[in-house]
Amino acid sequence: MSLPVTLSALDLGALLCSRICHDIISPVGAINNGLELLEEGGADEDAMALIKSSARNASARLQFARIAFGAAGSAGVQIDTGDAQNVATEYFRNEKPEFTWEGARVLLPKNKVKLLLNMLLIGNGAIPRGGSLAVRLEGSDTDPRFVITVKGRMLRVPPKFLELHSGAAPEEPIDAHSVQPYYTLLLAEEAGMKISIHATAEDIVFSAE
C-alpha cells in the first residue's frame, strides 16, 4: 500500500521527537513535583513513592521508544522479540489495558519489530477507556504474522490511522499527534507487510503479514 502523503526525513524526525517528548513529559514532570515536595520537607514517603513510580514510568517509555522509534542498533540488524516483549510489558504497566503477549521468541528484522511495537500503540489508541490488548506472533522468523486483538468500551479504530490506512489524502497535515499512525504504515511498507483491520462490536483485530 502506498501512503497518500510523504513526509521529508527532516519533518518525520522532528515530529517523532515531538511525539516522544509528549509521552515522557508527564512522568518527568511528576518526578519534579516529587522533588519539590521533598524540598518543602513534607510527606517524604509520598514524595519518594511518586518519584520512584514516575522514574519507572519514564524509563519504561524511553526503553519502548528506543526500539519502536529509534535505530536500536546498526542498519539491517535483527532484534529479539523477547526484548520487544519486555519493553512492551513494562510500557503497558502504566497504561489502562490488560496486556498479554503470546508467541515464540525469535530474531526478526529491525523494521518488523518496530512495526509490531507501533501496532501496539495503534491498538492502545483503539480502547481509550481501557480493556484488554492481546498480542499473538504467528508464522516463522522468515515469514511472521502479527495479530493484535483489542477489547473494551468505546472501541474504535483511531481516526487518523483509519484515514491514512484507507489511502485517502489526510484532511489536515501530519502533526505530532498523527505522525505515529503515519510511521506505522511507513514501517509496514518498508517491511513488505500489509496491515489489515477487522472490526466488530466485540473487538478490533489488527494484523500484519
UniProtKB/Swiss-Prot annotation:
Gene3D superfamilies: 1.10.287.130, Histidine kinase-like ATPase, C-terminal domain (3.30.565.10). GO terms for molecular function: protein homodimerization activity; protein kinase activity. It is found in: Cytoplasm. Disruption phenotype: This gene cannot be deleted or disrupted in the absence of a complementary copy expressed in trans, indicating this gene is essential in B.abortus. The modification Phosphohistidine is found at H22. One of its GO terms (cellular component) is cytoplasm. It is an enzyme of class 2 (transferase). GO terms for biological process: peptidyl-aspartic acid modification; phosphorelay signal transduction system. Its EC number is 2.7.99.-. It comes from the Bacteria. Keywords: Cytoplasm, Kinase, Phosphoprotein, Transferase. Changing H22A: Loss of phosphoryl transfer from CckA-P to ChpT. Is phosphorylated by CckA-P on His-22. Component of a regulatory phosphorelay system that controls B.abortus cell growth, division, and intracellular survival inside mammalian host cells. This signaling pathway is composed of CckA, ChpT, CtrA and CpdR. ChpT efficiently and specifically shuttles phosphoryl groups from the CckA kinase to the receiver domains of both CtrA and CpdR. Does not bind ATP. Overexpression of chpT results in a defect in cell morphology, DNA content, and intracellular survival in human macrophages. Belongs to the ChpT phosphotransferase family. Homodimer. Forms an asymmetric heterotetramer with CtrA (2:2). There are at least two modes of interaction between ChpT and CtrA, only one of which is competent to catalyze His-Asp phosphoryl transfer. Each ChpT monomer is composed of an N-terminal dimerization and histidine phosphotransfer (DHp) domain and a C-terminal domain that is structurally similar to the catalytic and ATP-binding domain found in histidine kinases but that lacks regions required for ATP binding. This is Protein phosphotransferase ChpT. It comes from Brucella abortus (strain 2308).
